[in-house]
Amino acid sequence: MANHHLLLILLVSASAATSLASVTPSSSPYSTVYELLEKYSFPRGILPEGVQDYALQRDGSFEVSLPGGCEINVGGFTLRYEGNMHGNIQSMLINELAGVSVKVAIKWVSINAVERHGDQLIFNAIVISKSFPVNKFSASPRCNRVPEIAK
């Protein structure tokens, strides 16, 4: 069960990374970063509410900005989003993810990739991988602000 929760946290982290584009919100055909996630076959719920800005480059590299760092609790795990996240997004794959981590026991572990396989999302961290049903991420969670995490 702990692995299931870790995967959920990893998925949320991956979503956040997927949100960026070379296109800024004002010039993007997508009005929100959440719509952009759906273009790449990811549910909007892998990214928390409150994204302030995003950018996506032609090569799939992206950046996402929140008002500040925040944490959510998912299935017994705590997931931390930094104020700025980045990675690379392709259809059904977010890799090179930075700025999202999960607390495993007493240690924070970076989530580095999220993959979609059918109706499952697979979250990858350095020490663990976990899969969750895509339908568990239909809505974006609210994030609890963490002042000590810089934007």
Task: Give residue ranges: language-model regions.
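Cleavable N-terminal signal peptides of Sec/SRP-targeted secreted and luminal proteins
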Residues: N3-A21
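A broad, low-specificity signal for short, low-complexity segments enriched in glycine/proline
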Residues: A14-S15, S22-S28, E82-M85
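Plant P/S/T-rich low-complexity glycomodules
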Residues: L20-V33, R145-K151
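N-terminal secretory signal peptides
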Residues: S27-G69
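Short, surface-exposed beta-strand-loop junctions and turns on beta-sheet-rich folds
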Residues: G69-N73, S129-K130
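Membrane-insertive, amphipathic helical modules of secreted toxins and fusogens
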Residues: N73-Y81
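Helix-rich interaction surfaces within compact, conserved domain-sized segments
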Residues: Y81-K151
